[in-house]
Every structure is written in C-alpha cells, then in structure tokens.
Amino acid sequence: MPDINELLRWSIANSTAPDTDASEQLQIRFNPNSTQSGTSTLHASDSGPPDISPASTPGPVTPDDGSSLPLPPGTEVPVTKKEDLTTEMLDLILGKGDSITMKEKMAFATDENNSVEDRVEALDDFEMLIELIDNANNMPILKLWDPLLTLLSSSHPEIVAHTCWIIGTAIQNNIKAQAAFYIHETFSRILEIIYPPSSISSYPPSVRAKATYALSAALKHWPLASYALYTATSSAENGYSVLRRGVNDPQAIVRRKMAFLVGTLAMQSGERYEGEIPSEVRNYIEENEKNAPSESLVEGLKREGVFTALVDGLKQGVDDVEYEENAMRALVRAHQKGGLTVSEKSDLKTIWEKWGKQGRQERGLDGEDGKEVSETLSS
C-alpha cells in the first residue's frame, strides 16, 4: 500500500489540467489586476524608480497584454509521467468501506495461522465496527455470523471471550440482530460457556462474564425472552435453571451480572416491545409465538426458583455489596409484580432492616431508592 509521501507526489504530479503541456506549465503569465505600479513614491507627481522587480513580480514595465515570457534557449522541459489512481490510493484517501473491513477482520481472526494476539486485535477492531447498528445488521448479508460462531469453540479462552463480547455488542438493543442471533441457534451455546458440560473444563471468570453479557443482551427487550429461557437446553438445563445457578455463582463477577439480569427481566416482564419491528423479524416472532408458553418472565423465574435462590444468597451474606444491591433491587421488582411468596417477602424485609441506614448507604440504596424499597416491603 502506498505511504502518504507517495500519495502526495501523485497528487502533485496529477493536479494540472489535462490539456496543458509541460512547456506551458513552466511559462509565467502576468495579468495585473490594476494599472497601479508595483513601486511607490512619496508624492503623486514624483516619477517612480526604475523597474528592478523580478519577472515573477508585476512592475511598471511588466507586460500587461497577457503575453508569456518564454523559457531561455536550451532549457529542457521535464516530462512528468502521470499515474492512474489505484484502488490502494483510493483506500488511503477515503478509507475502505466498513463491509470490506469487517470481512477482512473476520477472515484474519478465524485464520489459526495468525497469532492469538493478532487475532484478538482483529476481533477488537471488528467489535468497534459493529457498534454501529447498520454494520451489526449487515452481518447476515455479509455471511459473518457463521464464521464468528465457530470461534466459540476455540481452544483459546481470549478468543472465546472476545467472540462473546462481539455477540453482546451486536445484539444489544437491536431486535434485528437479536433475531439473527436466535436464527443461528446461538442461545444454547452461550449457556454452555457459562456452565459447560461436565466433559468440558470450566472457562475463566473473564470468559464467563463476557458470555453472561451476551446472555443479557440476548434477553433484554426480546419479545420471546421467556420462550428462549424455557426451551433452550444446555447440559440438560434450560435458561431459567442457568439463571438460578448463576445468581449464587462462586465467581463474584458472574453472580453480580446474573443478579442484575434477573432484575432487568423482572422489570420487563409483561411489557410489550414498543419499538419498530422489521417485517422479517415480525414474521419470525409470530411463527415462534405459536409454540411459546403463556407464562410471563416473572412467572417463569418464580417457577424455576430463581427468586428463592436470590433470597438465599442474601441470607448467606457473601460480603459483596454490589451483588447485594443488585439482588435487592431484583427482588423488589419481582415483589412489585407478584413474584415473591409471603415467606420470601418476610425474609427480604428482615434483611433490609438488618442492614440499617449505614448498610443501605454502602449498597447504594439510600435516598429515593431506599424509600422505594421500604415502601414496597411494607405494602
């Protein structure tokens, strides 16, 4: 690819009009804009000094008829060879289109002959591109979902983590990309990264956290979230049971995200998607709704014991204020939608009172948020 100096040389060599030959380029024309001389005197009646201005500067005796000063005899006129503007030069000037760059980055990332570090860098670049919703929606057209999903089976944890990160970014708050995610049957594969089958070693916390991020993005605002959790199977577990395990996961980064996700699902339970739905996505949703259970998200979470597991986690006192904040918020939302039993509500109220003013402040639940919790648990 040409460097910037080569590009500048090309632009200079090709910047003249095509009908001007080299000799004309070196001739200098003078067209004074006024009859005013190029020198000045103290009084208007004084005569000006002799013209000693160079040829390039208009003076009193400079030709004013537009004639040219020819080159001295024997002067050789250099011939400039013009070059065609190449694709590489255009790429350097304008930059490659995102679609081309996305395909190149994915091809590089899936090539195992490249180093893991370089492949991860390519995935980083790809993730930045699909932050734009149009690029994320173009992934099916560019046939990039299939090669991306092959990376979920990589033996390198950092490759798997970045793949989950890309998936989460692509589908977050993007119903069209969410549909592509489910069409490619990716949901169960994400669950298996969070809780692999017994025959597969567990992934590091950083990988499982990225997979939980992708799980959250797949469910948030998705009209068929309850259906996805009910039907998806991973190691003989459905999505609801993965959430139940997740809220008490031994790894703090995972259980915090799981508790937050449960709160998000409780909040969106019973709500209808209000955004615009493309026709192809609407057709997919309507077709799958025929087989979907009638239960809401809160009903499914309650049936599977997810709320009970969260209450148990708070009762155990894991010394993790971020987790406890997320769990309390999730359970309050669940109670507001009828998701807690009388016993669970009583246990939650006891925990809330035990925290006291200082404990609530430590967990970010003072002020208006704390007032809402107190009122909800007292109702």
UniProtKB/Swiss-Prot annotation:
A Pfam family matched in the record: Fes1
GO molecular function: adenyl-nucleotide exchange factor activity
Gene3D superfamilies cross-referenced by the UniProt entry: Leucine-rich Repeat Variant
GO cellular component, one term: endoplasmic reticulum
Entry superkingdom: Eukaryota
Segments passing through the bilayer: none
PANTHER family: HSP70-BINDING PROTEIN 1, PROTEIN FOLDING REGULATOR
Family of the protein in this entry: Belongs to the FES1 family.
Stated name of the protein: Hsp70 nucleotide exchange factor FES1
Gene that encodes it: FES1
